UniProtKB/Swiss-Prot annotation:
Glycans are attached at residues 72, 260, 278, 344, 379, 547. It is a multi-pass membrane protein. One of its GO terms (molecular function) is G protein-coupled chemorepellent receptor activity. Coiled coil: none annotated. It is found in: Membrane. This is Metabotropic glutamate receptor-like protein H.
Amino acid sequence: MKNILKILILILICINKINCLDGDGKQFRMIMLLSANVNDMGFNNMMNQGRIGVSKNLQIEDSRLIVVDGENDTKALVEPILQNEDIDFVICSSQGHTVACKYFADKYLKHPTVKTQFLIRGSGSSTANLIQFNYNFASCNYMSGYFAGLHTKTNKIGFLSPGAPKVNDAWVYAFWLGAKQVNPKIQFFYYNVGAFLNPDASERATNDLLERGCDVIGNTLDDFSSGITIMSKGYRTIGTNGFPQKLIYGEKILYSYAYNWTKLFLPIAMSVKAGITNNTNGYGDFNLDESKNFFNIEYSYGVSTDTINRMNQQITFLKSNSRFTHPYYCNEYLPEYTKKNNLNLSTSPTVNNLICIDHSTFLKINPPFPGMTYLGIYNISLVEVEFSQSIQNGFSITTGILIGITILMMIGIIKYSKTPSMRSASPIFLNFILAGGIIVYIGIIVWVGPMSTHSCNARLWLVTLGFSTLIGSLVVKNFRIWLIFDNPELKSIKITNYQLFPWVGACLVINIILMAILTSVGDLKQIDAMNIDSLGKYEYMKVCKMNSSGASTLYTILAYFAALLLVGVFVSWKIRIVDILEFNESGAIANTLYAISFCLFVIVPLMISPQDMQSETIILCTTGLFITTAALLIIFIPKFWRVFRKGANDSEINFNKKKSSSVATARAESGSKGSNGNASSGNRTNRRGNVVSGDFTDDSESSVGDENQKEKEKIKDDVANVTSGAVLAEFTDEASDTDNNEFNDIELSEQPPSIIVNDSENNN
């Protein structure tokens, strides 16, 4: 008994294998091409259901699904498969595959090895390897409109279609006619959305139709985005894309029709598997023979019995009559419409002498009939996402306040320019530094302002020129201090402001040249950017963009600023030996560079990490404000504080001496030895040598035990008094006896007693 069961199982397995083979005894291979993914819950999903149904009925193991659309993409993807694999049957489901599949059929019609047969959308003649199929899309849309006319409560219905050039609006006309036949009072509105699959446009267009009062909305789209939008508003809807929506959404679907592609594809696939090349086309429609009936109709419990009965009566009428005499081909509106739009009426005789059009003329219907309200192509308007107005106002107000403070500082410098604290720092260069800060502030206001090509260029020009002016003036004026005080030979040096102006100008000229290159070759302009940051699909933001040449130039500008900062570091390090606080700005420069370095330490990781444009702008502008404001405060607060502490009317050249550096001491000692020569030179020495040795060193430590120490200290202080006044004159370019910095040896007793040098360690 067990042996008999084993034999029966083997026989069944063999029969199953034989059924999977075609007439030549090889495995049957089938491919279906889809224009979109099967999860559209519409046309493509139902096509795939047809493939599955054929595969089950014919027990096809190698049944593939390929998503591709368009002639070129279809050729590129499918042809290698045809050449390298023995494919028997290809179903080209979409009109986007038609041209490519016809090309394959013609190319391989008499090919010795490629015996593939192709099933394409159309109604033309068949060949040995080309079969065409179609379905009556007019009849299902006519019946959907018929239902809409029966069910509407507002007498307003709507429709969505792809529209030309994808497809003419003949199907829209069929829907409208169905409603018009049963409800002459109907008002009809429709949109084109540009494609069979455009959920964004269909959702927005559906909302518009709902706002117009439409309570039933149909469509000829591939997906169910319109129906989902309607249900999200709390309404029930109809399913008009060939998918049995009631299976998913239940009683929210008032009415739907579903395609049964298995009934259409199965006879054709059986013929191909049997090796028959005398092919005939396939067509899907309402049919009295249920095995051939292509459409399955379903209703919700909310639909009245009267509506269902009238629907069934009309469907029976369509099944019982030739489709060429159906109402959408033959009605009283056609004569006037065809005449107006240069279309032809059918000349074929019909029953009861009906006035009709043929199918080719039907497909040319596109302009609306009287009573159809065409709302046009629904274009989704792009929405600009603007920079936050509150942030923009915050930056602008803050920067405006800082500009006002900076202007007050400039006025203060002019007012107190005669005070030692200001005179020693070169007032004209102080104002240059402040002017550079104002330019940077203006650039930041432009940076957060409305975006345009002009503002994209202006903000870079302003910010770079501002920093060049600020940093360049700071470096150049302190370069003069270094040259005067870092003087091992203790020679008299005169450097006027007019001699320094070209150096500041050179810093600006370099900046201008680099920015001119960026402007000319960088193609810096404002563009409307989409798909950036967290923007929606139909949102855009105005941003500044430059090409690679512009980016390279910008990096060069940044390198130039880095070099300028390095020079500033060098100068600040060199002037650290200056013992007079008014002339020593090494601390201010160092603190400014520290602030810049701190910002770079924070900003670089932030800029490298993903940032949206608004966050990037906030970071850059905040950094620019901080660097500029910190630099100005670090440089100018001590100066104004000294003016406040000493008094605005202080006429004394009252310098503060800080603790001497070891470098200054060493240089002073070297200078003293070179200038004294021997003991006989006594008290007559170079005055600048004396001031360096006396004011910039701590000689009390090196001369302990000298019985004349107190007298020497007095002599050095007196010499320092005269030379300090001379040095101050060099920084102000004022006409005086010391402007040329050339001093004759005079007796110490001749020094003016009003010039005082204070030791900062003993003077608070």
